[in-house]
Structures are given as structure tokens and as C-alpha cells.
């Protein structure tokens, strides 16, 4: 399914993946691209850890879809700052799910191979996660919040 003429909110859009997703969707849609680091003029400030601001922006922009790319991805930083990793990667996604459920908006959540322990050569969608790092555990928490909310 190709989305056209939709309002799409993309969080965590400041990195390489965010730029690629933004460029893909902006062609045929009205995109609000956001990040906590406004390193590009097309980025709006949104912090997924702030549920009140997520509600406010979602009520005014009225997205048809929310794509959450927001994450702390630096493995060493996450290990040294586990609370911040869980608040950003886990609670941030939980906040998005709460807003999305309240306003009836579908959500796309980007996870990581880091939810697996690396014992197998290949993993499938339904393999049992076993994250070893704080980063993997925090992203897995985000997955669980997404599953729980939908």
C-alpha cells in the first residue's frame, strides 16, 4: 500500500534513516519531521519523552500515521546511562502508543536486531527475543509497549 495525501508524523528524523524515510514520504504526503536535535531546517522539535507535547502536536497536526524513529542508539552511551535509554527508547514509544490509541492513529515502530542475543546466524520475526545490552532491552521494551497497545 502506497500512502498519498496523508498527514505523517515522523519522530527521530534527524539521522540517516530519518532522512531516507522523510524523503520517501514527503513526495506524496504532508510530513511533519521531528527530532530533539534540530540539525536541519525541515525538522521540528518533538521529544517523545514528553507526552503532553506529543498530544498537543498530534491534536493540531492530525496525523494519519506516526512513524517513530526516535531512539538512543549509541550502545556505550546506553550502557552508561540505562535510565535515559529506557526513558527514550521504551517510555518514548509507550507515550507514542498512548497518544496514538487515544487519537486512533496507526503507529510504525522501528526496532533493532539488538533484541536478539546473536546465538543464531539468522533470526525471524517470531523468534524469541533475548536482548543482552541495555540498548537491546530498552528497544524490546518499546516493542512490548507497541504490541500491548495494539
Tell where the protein language model's regions lie, with residue ranges.
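Conserved glycine-rich Rossmann-like NAD(P)H-binding loop of the short-chain dehydrogenase/reductase
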Residues: 16, 30-40
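Rossmann-fold cofactor-recognition segment
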Residues: 36-52
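NAD(P)H-binding glycine-rich loop region in Rossmannoid oxidoreductase-like domains
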Residues: 48-88
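Helix C-cap/helix->beta junction micro-motif
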Residues: 61, 102-103, 149
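NAD(P)-cofactor binding segment of oxidoreductase domains
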Residues: 80-108
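Catalytic helix-loop patch of NAD(P)-dependent Rossmann-fold dehydrogenases
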Residues: 87, 91-95, 115-150
Amino acid at each position: 500500500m502506497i500512502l498519498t495525501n496523508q498527514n505523517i508524523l515522523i519522530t527521530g528524523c534527524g539521522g540517516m534513516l530519518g532522512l531516507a524515510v522523510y524523503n520517501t514520504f514527503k513526495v506524496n504526503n504532508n510530513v511533519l519531521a521531528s527530532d530533539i536535535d534540530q540539525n536541519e531546517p525541515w525538522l521540528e522539535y518533538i521529544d517523545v519523552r514528553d507526552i503532553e507535547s506529543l498530544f498537543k502536536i498530534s491534536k493540531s497536526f492530525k496525523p494519519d500515521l506516526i512513524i517513530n524513529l526516535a531512539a538512543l542508539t549509541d550502545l556505550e552511551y546506553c550502557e552508561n546511562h540505562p535510565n535515559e535509554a529506557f526513558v527514550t527508547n521504551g517510555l518514548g514509544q509507550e507515550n507514542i502508543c498512548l497518544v496514538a490509541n487515544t487519537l486512533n492513529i496507526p503507529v510504525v515502530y522501528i526496532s533493532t536486531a539488538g533484541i536478539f542475543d546473536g546465538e543464531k546466524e539468522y533470526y525471524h520475526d517470531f523468534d524469541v527475543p533475548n536482548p543482552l545490552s541495555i540498548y537491546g532491552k530498552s528497544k524490546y521494551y518499546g516493542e512490548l509497549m507497541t504490541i500491548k497497545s495494539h
